[in-house]
Amino acid sequence: MSEKAFVTVTALTKYIKRKFDVDPHLEDIWIKGELSNVKIHSRGHVYFTLKDENARMQAVMFQRSAAKLPFSPKSGMKVFVRGGIQVYEPSGNYQLYAKEMQPDGVGALHLAYEELKKKLASEGLFDARYKKPIPEYPEVVGVITSPTGAAVRDVITTINRRYQQAKIIVLPALVQGEHATRSIVERIKEANEKQLCDVLIVGRGGGSIEELWAFNEEAVARAIFASDIPIISAVGHETDFTISDFTADMRAPTPTGAAELAVPSTTDLIERIKSIDIRLTRAVKNQTSQAKDRLLALQSSYAFRFPKRLQEQKEQQFDLVFDRFQKQLTRQIEQKRSQLDRQTYRLKPLHPKEQLLQAKKRHANETEQLIRSMNVQMKTIHSQFQSVLGKLNALNPLQVMERGYSLAYKEDELIKSVNQVETKDQLTITMKDGRLICEVIEKEGQSS
């Protein structure tokens, strides 16, 4: 067999892949099936198997598409998947590269309902702390519903029967179909912006989940939550629960029930007024009877029979109390005065004037002591000075001259020996009262 009769696995796989790539029916296709082996990668990619009763195929949805899904894919879900079929060359298998995914049929609505309910609950839109109280006696009741349905007739009839004082404003809105969500949201905003009423009833009669779906839309739920006017939700029958029921300030099982919650019953109010009137009449009678008994008791009392004597007794009691008070006050004043004197005595040494006086006394004493000490020291110094002066005088040449001695100088040099002079030397003789200029005629004494 020639080599041309054979192809490689790679070549065949590439050939098949090209066939898939150029087929317009496989490039963008919707496939219905059941999810199986769903695995969500850490990077956000979703790998799964799409199957029915007779076949299965591998599929992948990359993170950029998976991030847009309004729900979390799980095994067992019936879904519609949109994407393209391509061949994965390494394994030779074909697989679906998914771009969109939607739950199948009614199951999709239930899934979307649960997903939105979970989302809004996590944001706190259902929390009781945000619920506004329904006014007890509203003057104006607003009704957002279809103007031609049975629901609006039931609400109007019930309010007129129960509480004719309330004015009813019907804000007509679409309650099913493609434009119902926008219509309901606009009516809620209009009622708030124009402050049309004291309480709002938002709802409709019963129907299938598809017909009631506008009240499960996120936009309607958020408009109800944002409303400043308290809202009563009344959608469908008693067993029907919508997202609007959870975000509303109060939920009614039916439109008729909403009307009963919105306004009080005039009959009930009349009965309540009658009951209050009976209780008030009985209370007034009881209080009047008790007051009459107290008055009779007072009239028969000692004070009414002998008022002057009672006055005299009270005056005596007042005098006694006044005397005790005066004595106690005097005693307290004396105690306070004694305490003040003691405090004054203790504080006197601390008074600046007293401290200044004491400082002056200390200064005078210290000055006197300093003067005495200085006098003693001066006397001692004077005595020492006289002693030193006497010694100095004893050594003073002038003092020696006073006793008849003189000093001889040769050219300003004191002559202490005859050996310092020669015959005919000129000498200066200093005496106590002057000097003599002499010439040596002869010298006597021992020569050195």
UniProtKB/Swiss-Prot annotation:
Membrane-spanning intervals of the chain: none
Catalytic reaction(s) noted: Exonucleolytic cleavage in either 5'- to 3'- or 3'- to 5'-direction to yield nucleoside 5'-phosphates
Assigned GO CC terms: cytoplasm; exodeoxyribonuclease VII complex
InterPro entries noted in UniProt: Exonuc_VII_L, Exonuc_VII_lsu_C, OB-fold_nuc-bd_dom
Localisation: Cytoplasm
S-S bridge residues: none
Superkingdom: Bacteria
Signal peptide: none
Enzyme class (EC, first level): hydrolase
A Pfam family it matches: Exonuc_VII_L
Keyword annotations from UniProtKB, A to Z: Cytoplasm, Exonuclease, Hydrolase, Nuclease
Function: Bidirectionally degrades single-stranded DNA into large acid-insoluble oligonucleotides, which are then degraded further into small acid-soluble oligonucleotides.
Name of the protein in its database record: Exodeoxyribonuclease 7 large subunit
Species whose genome carries this gene: Bacillus pumilus (strain SAFR-032)
Name of the encoding gene: xseA
